[in-house]
């Protein structure tokens, strides 16, 4: 029998060493023990996979950019090599995303009871995120499917968060941040993105007195990111120049 506490300890250690693949493997094993995760364990799982998938997302963007330049140069041999490398990174990214989505569907979301609104929103947001990461690299029918799944997860999380969580809650704010990025980057719907981000920001500002001392820093940081994205997106709509979105 694997010692749960030892696995969690290993994940903490791996995080300090910035060995995120090890961290993810440890937290995957914890999740597969099929017991509810504590807030700390939930965050360890999230941080581990965010870094594992983040490295692949970053690599994919770099290689895609090189692929476009190589295509313009017309160097067939180099083009073939770059394409093959992009596809290799894509496969890695897809494997990581499918791993997370399996954990969410088979254990984490499934085991949330009717009163665990915070956990349910956290996991549904995560599900929306990992389908969004798949949508970033998918094309054709495959893309349509993952976009639909992402939208469905975000939408369900959004409804629960509006009904059961304070507008200043960092999980509700983080969901609004990522859901609005989904509208802007994946759905190419800047008006919906701006509306969602602005509503979340304004609702939180209106209830600043409900800010929990423990989560004050998290909440205000996400509010700042929402505002930064709004500023970027509204200026983009005015001059149509791209920029780097916070997500």
Swiss-Prot record:
UniProt keyword annotations, A-Z: Cytoplasm
Tissue: Expressed in brain, gill, heart, intestine, kidney, liver, ovary, skeletal muscle, spleen and testis.
Intracellular or extracellular location(s): Cytoplasm
InterPro entries referenced in this protein's UniProt entry, alphabetically: 14-3-3 (IPR000308), 14-3-3_CS (IPR023409), 14-3-3_dom_sf (IPR036815), 14-3-3_domain (IPR023410)
GO cellular component: cytoplasm
UniProt entry tagged with the keyword Ribosomal protein: no
Principal cellular location given in the protein's record: cytoplasm
Induction (record text): Repressed under stress conditions such as netting.
Function: Adapter protein implicated in the regulation of a large spectrum of both general and specialized signaling pathways. Binds to a large number of partners, usually by recognition of a phosphoserine or phosphothreonine motif. Binding generally results in the modulation of the activity of the binding partner.
Protein name: 14-3-3 protein gamma-1
């Amino acid at each position: 029998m694997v010692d749960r506490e030892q696995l969690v300890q290993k994940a903490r250690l791996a995080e300090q060493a910035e060995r995120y693949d090890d961290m993810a493997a440890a937290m995957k094993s914890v999740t597969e023990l099929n017991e509810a995760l504590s807030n700390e364990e939930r965050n360890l799982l999230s941080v581990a996979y965010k870094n594992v998938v983040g490295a692949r997302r970053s690599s994919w963007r770099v290689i895609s950019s090189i692929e476009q330049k190589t295509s313009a140069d017309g160097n067939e041999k180099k083009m073939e090599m770059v394409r093959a490398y992009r596809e290799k990174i894509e496969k890695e990214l897809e494997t990581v995303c499918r791993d997370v989505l399996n954990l969410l569907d088979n254990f984490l979301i499934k085991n949330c009871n009717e009163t665990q609104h915070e956990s349910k929103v956290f996991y549904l947001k995560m599900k929306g995120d990992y389908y969004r990461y798949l949508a970033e690299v998918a094309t054709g029918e495959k893309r349509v499917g993952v976009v639909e799944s992402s939208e469905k997860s975000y939408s369900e999380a959004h409804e629960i968060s509006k009904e059961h969580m304070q507008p200043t809650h960092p999980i509700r704010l983080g969901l609004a941040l990522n859901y609005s990025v989904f509208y802007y980057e994946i759905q190419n719907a800047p008006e919906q993105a701006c509306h969602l981000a602005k509503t979340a920001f304004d609702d939180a500002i209106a209830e600043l007195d409900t800010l929990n001392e423990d989560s004050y820093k998290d909440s205000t940081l996400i509010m700042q990111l929402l505002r930064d994205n709004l500023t970027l997106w509204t200026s983009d709509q005015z001059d149509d120049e791209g920029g780097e979105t916070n997500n």
